[in-house]
């Protein structure tokens, strides 16, 4: 696996980020507008044509105690639709506190003007991709 595309699912905006497992780095991409959780599938198709992902990861919104919430099932449905449409493997990644971390990171970069909705969603997607890669990739042993 080398290219991973991650999604921070929302009913109005879906954050997107791309990660490279070879370098263990990720970058935010433009968020995709959604209508009641349904994205413009042609935009996602173009995104996949450009980046050629081998793995998809969808953030799984959970309550702080780990239980599911109403948005959890919608995110799972979105992931299942991605798999059905494009035939790519889809993993689900716990996304608790990713939006909070994304806001903190963006605010540190440029204050309130950086806190646009799409930017926060894609920064959250970046965190989802990084968390996925950190859990998936083998850890290196730097000891001698």
From Swiss-Prot:
Domain of life: Bacteria
Keyword Cytoplasm attached: yes
Signal peptide: none
CDD domains in the cross-refs: YqgF
Enzyme class, spelled out: hydrolase
Keyword annotations from UniProtKB, A to Z: Cytoplasm, Hydrolase, Nuclease, Ribosome biogenesis
One cellular-component annotation, GO: cytosol
Annotated Gene3D superfamilies: YqgF/RNase H-like domain
Gene Ontology molecular function terms on file: nuclease activity
EC number: 3.1.-.-
Subcellular location: Cytoplasm
GO biological process: rRNA 5'-end processing
Principal subcellular localisation of the protein: cytoplasm
Family: Belongs to the YqgF nuclease family.
Role summary: Could be a nuclease involved in processing of the 5'-end of pre-16S rRNA.
NCBIfam families the record matches: RNAse_H_YqgF
HAMAP family cross-referenced by the UniProt entry: Nuclease_YqgF
Protein name: Putative pre-16S rRNA nuclease
Organism, as annotated: Idiomarina loihiensis (strain ATCC BAA-735 / DSM 15497 / L2-TR)
């Amino acid at each position: 696996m080398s290219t991973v595309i991650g999604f921070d699912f929302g009913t109005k905006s879906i954050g997107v980020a791309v990660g490279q497992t070879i370098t263990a780095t990720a970058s935010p991409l433009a968020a995709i507008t959604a209508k009641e959780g349904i994205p413009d599938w042609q935009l996602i198709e173009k995104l996949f044509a450009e980046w050629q992902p081998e793995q998809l990861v969808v953030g799984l919104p959970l309550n702080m105690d780990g239980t599911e919430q109403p948005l959890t099932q919608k995110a799972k449905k979105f992931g299942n639709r991605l798999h059905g449409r494009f035939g790519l493997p889809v993993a689900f990644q716990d996304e608790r506190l990713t939006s909070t971390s994304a806001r903190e990171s963006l605010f540190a970069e440029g204050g309130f003007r950086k806190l646009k909705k799409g930017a926060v969603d894609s920064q959250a997607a970046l965190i989802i991709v990084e968390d996925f890669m950190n859990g998936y990739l083998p850890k290196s042993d730097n000891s001698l």
